[in-house]
């Protein structure tokens, strides 16, 4: 089989359509799956010895949240090292990273796999992976044809990364130096709320403004602070963390501003405070609402004049520190109640950010679950950790009062429970492995129990034949319209019909 000019042109056109990189990448992956008649396809970006999914088709949604470290995925490592088309034999001993992650085929393992590394010059920037359930599924395509596909995808990905880099540099102050070597914090989520938050982080990071990050407990406020710091001109300097809620009043001032020898009992030497440690960098004050009014006044002075005094010292020290503060309280209400200084609130909230709770983030819960599943897999040395359909349904309907932190702990606990009840190193998380209270799931549709007169394979094929016949009849035997009605692509429908003996 050879690609026609029309096929290649169609792929190129899809890469120019859409309003953003994510949309273009999704169109590319969907088109490739149709052209190559594969069961699953994915576009991955390479970063710091791991592959990060950018777009998928035919794979479980939680794949978008997973981070595939090379040391934990030998097939992906082979693709990264190859420099050319990689075809894995059906009997390859290397585990496929997508085993159990094709919806409806969780118990089956992928048979055919092709990997296409993507390069910008000599630099690896990503990969395309193509998977199928039939061992010889990609034999009809030559390496040269697959290289053409890889070249188109590499060009699109390279341009997207270049535009991203230029946009980031354009937001920097004129005298700022790009810092490409800094690893960027991964903020997982594609929901509207998270997309907007990422845009706001990108905007404010390039400035030197103080930022007030608000959100419920467990939403990831510290991660937001890290993302701001790492995307700022201060990224080459330290990010210093201080939890204000954990500070006893007796040592709080010393922790913030330092002390000199003999300033108080136990001060046996000079000690720098968090502000000195963060000089030329960023200081993250978590739970800022817990500071006493006396300390709030001293913090306000630092923000106003940029100098500090160590406890027991009359001299002032100049510091250049950007302050990021976080709270799970409504500081406006705290100001009205007299528990928080209004002038400090206005100093801190020059650019306020709000982190949405997990219950408002839609399918992000599945992406995050995939991320935590992959973390558990690596930590426990398992070959795979996947979510069953029932587990995904449960996660999507639970409200998570503890937000992302609660989800993380729930996944870790479920993996441990599932591992204890299953032999081997493969774990499938079922709904019963989660101990969520008061979860109301949509009621299942009632169905009569049929009398079994044939084996499971025969019953499945009979059902598929009848479903296809009915769909064809309703669509005047138009296979494309039939495929749309059945919510599958036409190439897969033709292959299924042939296997069922409905087509020559």
From Swiss-Prot:
It holds the Pfam family GAF. Residues 187-416 form the Sigma-54 factor interaction domain. CDD domains: AAA. The lineage of its organism: Bacteria, Pseudomonadati, Pseudomonadota, Gammaproteobacteria, Enterobacterales. Residues 479-498 bind DNA. One of its GO terms (biological process) is phosphorelay signal transduction system. The gene is norR. Pathway: Nitrogen metabolism; nitric oxide reduction. This is Anaerobic nitric oxide reductase transcription regulator NorR. PROSITE patterns: SIGMA54_INTERACT_1, SIGMA54_INTERACT_2, SIGMA54_INTERACT_3, SIGMA54_INTERACT_4. GO terms for molecular function: ATP binding; ATP hydrolysis activity; DNA binding; DNA-binding transcription factor activity. InterPro entries: AAA+_ATPase (IPR003593), GAF (IPR003018), GAF-like_dom_sf (IPR029016), Homeodomain-like_sf (IPR009057), NorR (IPR023944), P-loop_NTPase (IPR027417), Sigma_54_int (IPR002078), Sigma_54_int_dom_ATP-bd_1 (IPR025662). It comes from the Bacteria. It comes from Shigella sonnei (strain Ss046). ATP binds at residues 215-222, 278-287.
């Amino acid at each position: 089989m050879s690609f026609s000019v029309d096929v290649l042109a169609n792929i190129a056109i899809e890469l120019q359509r859409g309003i953003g990189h994510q949309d273009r990448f999704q169109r590319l992956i969907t088109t490739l799956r149709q052209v190559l008649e594969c069961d699953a396809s994915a576009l991955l970006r390479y970063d710091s010895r791991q592959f990060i999914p950018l777009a998928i088709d035919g794979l479980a949604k939680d794949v978008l949240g997973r981070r595939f470290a090379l040391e934990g995925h030998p097939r992906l490592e082979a693709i990264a090292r190859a420099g050319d088309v990689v075809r894995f034999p059906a009997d390859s001993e290397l585990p496929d990273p997508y085993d159990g992650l094709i919806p409806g085929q969780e118990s089956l393992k992928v048979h055919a796999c092709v990997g296409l590394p993507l390069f910008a010059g000599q630099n690896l920037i990503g990969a395309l992976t193509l998977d199928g359930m039939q061992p010889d599924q990609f034999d009809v395509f030559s390496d040269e044809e697959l290289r053409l596909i890889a070249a188109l995808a590499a060009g699109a990905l390279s341009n997207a990364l270049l535009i991203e880099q230029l946009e980031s540099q354009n937001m920097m102050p004129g005298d700022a130096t790009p810092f490409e070597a800094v690893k960027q914090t991964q903020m997982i989520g594609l929901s509207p709320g998270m997309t907007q938050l990422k845009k706001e982080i990108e905007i404010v990071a390039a400035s030197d403004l103080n930022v007030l990050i608000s959100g419920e407990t467990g939403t990831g406020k510290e991660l937001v602070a890290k993302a701001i710091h790492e995307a700022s001109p201060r990224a080459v300097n330290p990010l210093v963390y201080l939890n204000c809620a954990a500070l006893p009043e007796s040592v709080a001032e010393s922790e913030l501003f330092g002390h000199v020898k003999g300033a108080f009992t136990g001060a046996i030497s000079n000690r720098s405070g968090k502000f000195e440690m963060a000089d030329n960098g960023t200081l993250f004050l978590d739970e800022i609402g817990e500071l006493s009014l006396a300390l709030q006044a001293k913090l306000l002075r630092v923000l106003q004049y940029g100098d500090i005094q160590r406890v027991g010292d009359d001299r002032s020290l100049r510091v250049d520190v950007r302050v990021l503060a976080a709270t799970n309280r409504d500081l406006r209400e705290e100001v009205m109640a007299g528990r928080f200084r209004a002038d400090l609130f206005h100093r801190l909230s020059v650019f306020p950010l709000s982190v949405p709770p997990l219950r408002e983030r839609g399918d992000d819960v599945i992406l995050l679950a995939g991320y935590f599943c992959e973390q558990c897999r690596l930590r426990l040395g398992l070959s795979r950790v996947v979510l069953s359909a029932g587990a995904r349904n449960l996660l999507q309907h639970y409200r998570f009062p503890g937000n992302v932190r609660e989800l993380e702990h729930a996944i870790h606990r479920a993996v441990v429970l599932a591992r204890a009840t299953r032999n081997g190193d493969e774990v499938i998380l079922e709904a019963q492995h989660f101990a969520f209270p008061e979860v109301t799931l949509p009621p299942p549709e009632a169905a009569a129990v049929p009398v079994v007169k044939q084996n499971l394979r025969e019953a499945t094929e009979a059902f598929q034949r009848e479903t296809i016949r009915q769909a064809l009849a309703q669509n005047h035997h138009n296979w494309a319209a039939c495929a749309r009605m059945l919510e599958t692509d036409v190439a897969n429908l033709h292959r299924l019909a042939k296997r069922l003996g409905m087509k020559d």
